[in-house]
Each structure stands twice: as C-alpha cells, then as structure tokens.
Amino acid sequence: MAVAVAEAGARNSTSQGDRAAAVRSRGRSWFLAWLAFLPLVVMRAGTLAESDTFWQIRTGLLTISHRAIPTVDPFSWTMHGRPWTLNSWAFNVLIAGAYRLAGLPGVAWTCAGLAMVAAGLMLFLARELGASPFVAGALLLFTSPLLVGWLSARPQLVDYAAVLVLAILLRRIAAGGKRIWLVLAVGIVSVVWVNLHAGELFGVGMICVCAVALFAKRDLRASGWCLAAGAVAFAGSFLSPYGFGMLGQAAQVQSASAGVVIEWQHLDPTSPTQCAMLAMGLGALILAARRRDFVLVGVLCVVAAGSIMAIRLLPMLVFVALPVLAPSLSRTPVASLLLRRRIVLYLGLAVAVVLALIDMSHIGRPSPALYPVGVVRDIPSDCRLFNSYELGAFVIFERPDVPVSLDSRNDMYGRQRVLADEKTLDGKGDVARELAGADCVLVPPATGLAKWLRSDHGWKLTASDSAAALFVRIR
C-alpha cells in the first residue's frame, strides 16, 4: 500500500513538473514572438521623420523648465500669444525627459518602447483568445509592413496600446469577476490616456458601443457594467489640466485637419495598403461576431468605422484585428504551413535584424531627406521666418530663437491659414504681400516660392541643400 502511494505521489510530482515545464516553454514562445517585432521597431526608430515630434520635444522642455504647461503660442510670429491647448502635454513631457537624458536617441528609444508595449498587448490578447504563439508572432511579422510607417514618435502610439488595454478589461468585465475593480481600472487607464493624448475620447465612445452590443446580446448585467465603465471613463476624460475644454479642443483638431493633413483623409478605395488593413479589420469583425464575442464586435465596429472616416485609425484597427485573426489561423492548415516553412520566417527575421543593427548606428537621427540641420543652423537669430508646414516644427526644436510662420500644429493655425500658406509655397497669388512680415524664408528648393525668390532682387540665397533653401531679405 505504501509503495502504491509513493508511486502515485511520484507520478503526480512528475505530472506537475511536466506542466510547469510546458508553461515555461509556452511563455518563452510568446516572449520570442514579441521579441521578433523589435528589429522592425528599431528600423522605424532609426530615423525621425514625423514633424510633430520636434515641436512636442521643445514644448515638453518648455513645460519642464517653467513647471507649467504653455497656455499661449510661444513659437510663431503669425500666431504669437494666441491661446493654445495642447492635446498631448504629458507625452510632450515624457519625450522631453527622454531627450534631456539621452538626446534624440532617447526619444527614439522611448517611442520604440511604446510600440513594443502595443505589440505585447496585442500578443497578450491573442493568447487570451487561444492563439498559437508561433502563428500570432508570424502574423505580426507579416503585417508589420502595414504598421511600421505608422509607428512614428508621436502620441498615437499611446492610443494603440490604450485601445488594447480597454479591450482586455472590457472582455473581463463582460465575463464577470471583480467588476468594480475592473471598472476602476478603466477609469485609471482613461485618466492616464487623456493626459498623454486627447485620443482617449475615442475610447469612451468605444466602451459605450460595447455596452450596446452586449445589450443586443441580452446580457443586461454585463451591459450595465460596461455602461458604468463608460461613465467612469467619461468622467476621467476631464481629469486633465484642461478639464471640459478638452472636448472643444478635440473638435478643433478634427476640423482644422480634415482635408489638410493626409492621415485625416477618408479611406482611399484605390489604395491596396489601406484596403488590406480595412479587410483585416472586417475579417476580424466577422470572426468576433461568429464567436459571439460582443466586446470585440463593439471595439472593431467603432475602430473600423473610424478608419473609413480617417485613415489615421487604420493601424489601431490592425492591432485590434490581429488577436482575433490569430486563433482562427492557429486551427487551420495555415498553422502547419507556417511551421513547415518557418525557415523562410527565420531568414526574413535575420534580414530585419541586420537592417536594425545598421539603423542602430543613427537611432533618432532627423531624416536628412526632410530636415536640413546645417541650413537651419544658418538662419539669423530672431529672423522672422516664412517656412513650409513640415520644416516649421524642426526649426522650433533646433532654433527656438527663430519665430516661424507655420508648423504642424494645424489646430493652432487653422485650416484656412495652412491652405493659404500652401498656395504661397507654390508661388501663387500675391507672394510679396504674403511675405511682407518675414525677413527669412526656408522652403524646399524645388517649390514655386523658391524659384520666385531666386528671381527677386529683394532676396538673397544664403544656404541650400537637397531638403531646403534659405533666403534672407536684402535691406
């Protein structure tokens, strides 16, 4: 009898050991799936190409040094002193702190970390839905060409992560459990999100649609808890330095950006990339509906509809769609095919690692094709500068002593101002009148305005490269 008990104990101990080993092995597989995304993120961080990044760093530095958020425009001569509401003040401080610690490489690494957080949350949700780590990781790698261009150093990275966190929390609220604590967690996420980026207001709408979807399922209890989460999230939206003013600011950004900024344009049905991203989202929506996962149905409905109205939401749609697609692919012949052809994946990953190592030599470098470092340094101090939309933010960062005419804070300048300056940049209209208040001009050398200035005796070309030409008024 004692021998039998001992043998049973030994078998039980062995079984527990095997399960623990399996858990550790599976955990390592998910970690490797997450780590495989790192080379692509590093490649994106190698060059800073987004103009917003530069004025956000400078604004964050200003906030830190003054220990107060700027309330009026301090950077331009066209809007100087005009009231200014920041939609990402905490993100600005975050990357400014990274800049103070490690310069532009610190900013690039910080934003790369945010991108990796979003990828990790995507894989976490895929794991909860029953996906294979290999398939989920492979799917993330295959779709990375669609995502990499959107992983620039901007507060939108926070949006990608926050939407996934909300999806995870809402699914747990719908499933039951400690719902009070989960609702409070939604509130905390909302407060952090709205201070990092005003995109949190989109999350409030997403929660409410999830509540409606659960109501349609006749799960009244879960729907009620989701509504409570939505109310808490809505209240959290006003726990920022701007309070209720954030609502008006969000509307102002949308109205000033529509038809001007590319990422705010409607979906282009002739774009294969945009259509592929939307197709992934719609496919995930169908799968979520078939599984009767009404939380994910609600999330995907809102993000897909938003993506049609503004393509800036397409990467968010892909991040939410991948965890839904991965479990289905894990149970199809696709999974076996990927395993048999994994050598192709490994080779592709090896190439990405090599390219990432090359990019690590210039992490955080401003794109030489867009930002003329040497020319900007040649601008005379305190010279009122007429500049192109993209170059303004870089001048704010590199030369805060030079007031600009325009930059990518389009909510500050307004749609009409941006369009009028684009017309002048083309050399059209009454160019002399538009330049009346400027002493210097910094524009790409191939623009109509640059050609006009070369032929005008009142201006002198003082510096030029492939990205920009600097003209100074002759007195």
Feature names for model-found ranges:
Residues 28, 34-35, 122-145:
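Transmembrane-helix signature of polytopic, membrane-embedded enzymes
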Residues 172-191, 223-228, 296-301:
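Short hydrophobic alpha-helices at membrane interfaces in multi-pass membrane enzymes
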Residues 121, 146, 158-176, 207-211:
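Specific aromatic-rich, kink-prone transmembrane helix
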Residues 52, 64, 69, 192, ...:
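Transmembrane catalytic cores of multi-pass membrane glycosyltransferases
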Residues 166-181, 282-291:
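Membrane-interface transmembrane helices that cradle and orient dolichyl/undecaprenyl
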Residues 379-418, 438-446, 471:
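Short periplasmic/luminal acceptor-recognition loop of GT-C membrane glycosyltransferases, typified by
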